[in-house]
Amino acid sequence: MKTIIVFLSLLVLATKFGDAKEGVNQEQKKEVTQNEFRVEYLNEMAAMSLLQQLEAXESALFEKEAGRNSRQXRCAMGDVPCTKGKTNCCKGYECKPKSPSWWYDTDFCQPIHGGRPIGI
């Protein structure tokens, strides 16, 4: 019976002092995790800033490349029907009547300066 009382008293003391240490440990854990989150947050913010800079540089390069490689798409060359209101003729061509003939109902893309257009 005496041994049981000794073990129970040791158990009570261990739990009492164990809880005290556990509280201190939890406070230390909170501080450590807060510091880790701060560091992780700062690292993440730096990474996001770097990512935004890279995306901005990449978009600028793509715009420059697209501007360099751009060309007129689907333009009409010589003797292709066109409409006066829409400019679907290529560079160096203009939409005008083919000849003073009455049977041509539409206009055609024709070179601006007679023969071969300038710039093509």
Swiss-Prot record:
Signal sequence region: 1-20
Domain of life: Eukaryota
Record bears the keyword Secreted: yes
Tissue expression profile of the protein: Expressed by the venom gland.
Transmembrane segments: none
UniProt keywords, alphabetically: Cleavage on pair of basic residues, Disulfide bond, Ion channel impairing toxin, Knottin, Secreted, Signal, Toxin
Statement: the UniProt record of this protein carries the keyword Signal: yes
InterPro entries xref list: Toxin_22
Location of this chain's protein in the cell: Secreted
Primary location group: secreted
Gene Ontology annotations for the cellular component aspect, listed alphabetically: extracellular region
Cystine pairings recorded for this chain: C75-C90, C82-C95, C89-C109
GO molecular function: sodium channel inhibitor activity; toxin activity
Function: Ion channel inhibitor.
Domain notes for this protein: The presence of a 'disulfide through disulfide knot' structurally defines this protein as a knottin.
Record-stated family: Belongs to the neurotoxin 14 (magi-1) family. 05 (ICK-7) subfamily. ICK-7 sub-subfamily.
Protein name: U13-barytoxin-Tl1a
